């Protein structure tokens, strides 16, 4: 399975790391935004080199010659995790000024699965309208909202819950959580 992963500058880097760790064995294409590089320094015990090592292919966010910027490059899904509100707003407005937003535009125009994982809260009416617009256009909006029916004992358990749901959405089997 070919999966494009964008890490934007929102809080929630542990979700991205755990997601990539669970995609081993799949063909992954990673883009880390400039803002995400800064957030990684604040939020993660992992460095950028480790995160990049989890992906099969890595691209800079300004590399418009990357294959994922073209509709002729076939991939199964794109996941932006975490997805900043700025990135959601750009995608909703059709702004493709970074590789992440360009690959998202490709996903939309080619009718490929696009999943955005916002972590922000509270949300403004504008944020909600942008997410609604994306959802109406086929994007899966999967907020990083852990469920508590699994009785998490740690932050890692809560991260596992969200990542398990994202993996389910892209069709990657996992046993990160106890299922009903």
Swiss-Prot record:
> Residues that bind FMN, according to the entry?
9-11, 33, 84-87, 119
- Can you list the disulfide-bonded cysteine pairs? none
Q: Which Pfam families does the record cross-reference, listed alphabetically? A: Flavoprotein
Which reaction(s) does its UniProt entry say it catalyses? Answer: dimethylallyl phosphate + FMNH2 = prenylated FMNH2 + phosphate
Q: Give the first-level EC class, as a single word.
A: transferase
What keywords are annotated for this sequence in UniProt?
Answer: Flavoprotein, FMN, Prenyltransferase, Transferase
InterPro entries, per database record:
Flavin_trans-like (IPR036551), Flavoprotein (IPR003382), UbiX-like (IPR004507)
- Which molecular-function annotations from GO does this UniProt entry contain? flavin prenyltransferase activity
Which EC number applies? 2.5.1.129
Xref: Gene3D superfamilies: Flavin prenyltransferase-like
Q: Where does dimethylallyl phosphate bind?
A: 149, 165
Q: What does this protein do?
A: Flavin prenyltransferase that catalyzes the synthesis of the prenylated FMN cofactor (prenyl-FMN) for 4-hydroxy-3-polyprenylbenzoic acid decarboxylase UbiD. The prenyltransferase is metal-independent and links a dimethylallyl moiety from dimethylallyl monophosphate (DMAP) to the flavin N5 and C6 atoms of FMN.
Q: Which family does it belong to?
A: Belongs to the UbiX/PAD1 family.
Name the UniProt record assigns to this protein: Flavin prenyltransferase UbiX
At the highest ranks, the source species' classification is: Archaea, Methanobacteriati, Thermoplasmatota, Thermoplasmata, Thermoplasmatales
Name of encoding gene: ubiX
